[in-house]
Amino acid sequence: MATIHFTKVHGSQNDFFLVDEEGNQIMDWSDAKRADFAIKLCDREHSLGGADGILYVTKSSEAGPIGQMRVVNSDGSIASMCGNGLRTVARYLLEKHALTEAKVETMKAILDVKKATSLGFDIPTYQVEISPVKFNAESLPMNVGVEKLFNQVVPELDAELAFSAVSVPNPHLITFVDQTVLDSDRQETLASYLNSENPYFPDGVNVSFVKRLSDDAIYVRTFERGVGFTNACGTAMSACSLIKKMLDKDTFETPLNVYNDGGRVQVTAKKDEAGDISLQLIGNATFVSTGSVSYESDTVTELTNEATPEQAQYQELVKEVKEFLKTTE
């Protein structure tokens, strides 16, 4: 039996158990064991309430970063990137090392992270880099008959909606819709199909429906690959912000307010001299509780769990967001 200590965290109410592999002396765990533990602990019927996944934090394989993040979804699958999760990992590592900015290694890139000005209500807020950004079909992968899909109708997916596809680096399929389409079952039907065996996105894809709220604000709802509908998806909010900026020819560096069922974040973008795009995701990094579980081959049992006051702070922001969104329906 192993005793595993955790921090329950969330970014935009996209919730996770953060597990420090070095602190728990589990750096030798196999990927299969990490997946099994995630499936058991993240079960929504578990006494701890489950989660969308586990953020495994360990030493970086490179010299520069202060740590490495590995994301395992609640179904045991691996996510190449998670923007909401990265904000909480950024906070954990920056506080651990008494820093305000640093680099963190993810599966596909080494990314800049730093502490940011609070979004309000004294909510701990962090800024993380989202990159690399690619549009080519192979990066997703995607098979819809074009090398780059940007604001284009794909009859095989939907007869009316115009889609854009981008990897950041996990794959995203994005369309801008009105409230009527949001209220329909079209998103769930399409996303469920594209995340089962299909010829268009063989590895599945995150599917986001986006509603414009104003020149500097959008609402995003995402069906996440390996998870389903969640309160928010950080990389999706980043990807949708980029597509909005490109469609509307917005200034990349101007912050875009992104609303979702989990709260609100801000996203900026920049393009370097080589033409490469990177995104900056700014949002909460809330520590909900700390605790421990016992892990045996067939069960994960709660041992301790102590709540922090941070969730109450975040709920003030959620209340504000819900009141605002009511005015946009």
Curated annotation (Swiss-Prot):
Segments traversing the membrane: none
* Molecular function GO terms recorded: diaminopimelate epimerase activity
List UniProt keywords, sorted A-Z.
Amino-acid biosynthesis, Cytoplasm, Isomerase, Lysine biosynthesis
- Name the chemical reaction catalysed here: (2S,6S)-2,6-diaminopimelate = meso-2,6-diaminopimelate
Write out the GO cellular component annotations.
Answer: cytosol
Q: Does the keyword Cytoplasm apply?
A: yes
EC number(s) stated in the UniProt entry for this protein: 5.1.1.7
Residue positions binding substrate: N14, N73, G83, N84, N170, N206, E224, R225, G234, T235
GO biological process terms on file: lysine biosynthetic process via diaminopimelate
Localization (cell) = Cytoplasm
Q: Where is this site: Could be important to modulate the pK values of the two catalytic cysteine residues?
A: H172, E224
The cross-references to PANTHER family, in alphabetical order and at most eight, read:
DIAMINOPIMELATE EPIMERASE (PTHR31689:SF0), DIAMINOPIMELATE EPIMERASE, CHLOROPLASTIC (PTHR31689)
Q: What does this protein do?
A: Catalyzes the stereoinversion of LL-2,6-diaminopimelate (L,L-DAP) to meso-diaminopimelate (meso-DAP), a precursor of L-lysine and an essential component of the bacterial peptidoglycan.
Protein known as: Diaminopimelate epimerase
Protein's organism: Listeria monocytogenes serovar 1/2a (strain ATCC BAA-679 / EGD-e)
